[in-house]
């Protein structure tokens, strides 16, 4: 057993991967044969990921606020606290906060054999993001 006492350092989401203010608290990192990676990710209103994929899929669990998510070619869905979204391995997608709401989710992935959790693509354009359904605020 290992207890890690309140020592999480918040990191700013890199501009190459995110649009807007995003803050990441690592919860679990791969170690000792485990390939599990989990983070609590905090999005300011309008902030979002770039298009990306995960080699072994990704689960996000919304814990606060209102968010949006979309797989390439699909509709933009509104997600709320308690919602869980699973993105299939290799499925191109994005997720983030609604325009007028903060959103926090726990992101869980299994890294690949080289330790990579994701492959990042282009930023979600303002036009793509603006196609989201209205969210009451």
Give the label of every model feature segment.
Residues 73-90:
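Short acidic-glycine-tyrosine-enriched beta hairpin
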Residues 59, 86, 100-119:
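A short hydrophobic beta-strand segment most commonly corresponding to one strand
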Residues 49-51, 69-70, 87, 92-99:
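Short beta-strand His + acidic residue motifs that chelate non-heme Fe in jelly-roll/DSBH
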Residues 40-44, 53-69, 108-111:
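Short, conserved beta-strand element in jelly-roll/cupin
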Residues 1-36, 117-137:
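A short, N-terminal "cap"/entry segment at the start of jelly-roll beta-barrel domains
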Residues 23, 37-54, 89:
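Conserved short histidine dyad/triad with adjacent acidic residue
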